[in-house]
Amino acid sequence: MFNVYEFFNRINEVRPESRLDAGQPDIPVRREIIEEAVESLRRGETGYTSTGGIRELRERIAEFEGVSADEVIVAPGAKILIAAEIASAKKVAVVSPRWNAYSLIARQFWREVEVIKTTLDERWIPRVEEIKADLIIINYPNNPTGRVLSGKEIRGLLDVAEENGVKVLSDEVYAELSFTRFTPARELYENVVTVKGFSKLYSMTGFRLGYAIGERNEIRRIQRFIESTVTCVPPFVQRAGVKALELRDELIKEVRRAYLERVRMASKMLRGFDFVEPEGAFYIFLRTPQDGMAFAERLLSRGVAVFPGMAFGDYPNFIRISLSGKGLERGLRVIREELECALESRATEGWEGSSRGVSAEGSR
């Protein structure tokens, strides 16, 4: 299995000029959020809190999610919540391409993984008649494709889950960054646990703050898992989360607009190549004329970092471009040059890349 973290460490060593690899938002955390965390620390809020999260934070989440506070649990990041669900399953199904953490976590718990592969030619729509697992993980808006399933498309998948008695874990961390109508899975099917976080909309990646929404008994089960592993979220982080939610409506408009502008720019610059224009999130999953890993290595030699498609499943002829890093326009120009060069030399023995010079800064 391709190790995305090892590749990420290599990128950090190279220090490329254009960082279009990780899903690390480059929009700064709002000053008010940071100040709230600092003030909380100054007030001495540094001890343990209740495992499920402080009441004020859960109530604010519940208010805009349209649920009760007892149906919400807060945790240090979304991963531990995903782990709690995977640990309770015997077999896990994942819709691919997907964030590789799902499979990595499943391996840690020795869980079998069923892969439901989707294709670019079918616009990444899952075509499935049976699910042979007791938990399926879905992620829309999708990382890495940017797809947002229509209400009809998501209903078709959830109907199969219901027919097979399968619980659904809906990773909706990019939900507020949807550029089209987004239908939460829990609106269409009862047996759904929704996982969301503060990393993408609020840029609070280092704060490690996530939450889950589910039926009360499910939330109590997740709480027992949190109690036996990571205990709780630091109180000053939760206070920052409360402040972030006060800014939520303003940030949704501001941040969504910023990423939509980038998506439109990137789609225009890469017009003519194979990808589905993103309907949410901030990624482009693009088919390469030749091997995606070799293509990613060539781009890295020119000071542009992207992730190869193998980081997201069995997609050797793809790369994922993140539109949230530095040097975006330069990186997109280099990617287009290399795509054009690869197409021109497709009929030859090998592809040596564009004749343009390697960036001195990017090769450090």
Swiss-Prot record:
Keyword Nucleus in annotation: no
Cofactor(s) demanded: pyridoxal 5'-phosphate
Any one annotated GO CC term: cytoplasm
Catalysed transformations (reactions): L-aspartate + 2-oxoglutarate = oxaloacetate + L-glutamate
Keywords, ordered alphabetically: Aminotransferase, Cytoplasm, Pyridoxal phosphate, Transferase
Compartment annotation: Cytoplasm
A GO molecular-function annotation: L-aspartate:2-oxoglutarate aminotransferase activity
Record's subunit section: Homodimer.
Protein known as: Aspartate aminotransferase
